[in-house]
Amino acid sequence: MFTLKKSLLLLFFLGTINLSLCEEERDADEEERRDDPEERAVQVEKRILPILAPLIGGLLGK
């Protein structure tokens, strides 16, 4: 039972470290994207196009 608890604790610890590293990398990527105006424009397009496509299609009668 003690070895099982030890193993679970080790897995939890390693998973926490891995999650922390992933969050740091994601935050760094987001900061980098915010600095680049071209990337920001692409992000806005990705958010707007799915909304506008059905509206335009409805107006055109498709």
Swiss-Prot record:
Domain of life: Eukaryota
Signal peptide extent: 1-22
Keyword Secreted: yes
A GO term from the CC aspect: extracellular region
Expression by tissue: Expressed by the skin glands.
GO biological process per UniProt: defense response to Gram-negative bacterium; defense response to Gram-positive bacterium; hemolysis in another organism
Alphabetical keyword list: Amidation, Amphibian defense peptide, Antibiotic, Antimicrobial, Cleavage on pair of basic residues, Cytolysis, Hemolysis, Secreted, Signal
A Pfam family hit: FSAP_sig_propep
Similarity section: Belongs to the frog skin active peptide (FSAP) family. Temporin subfamily.
Protein name: Temporin-CDYb
Organism name: Rana dybowskii
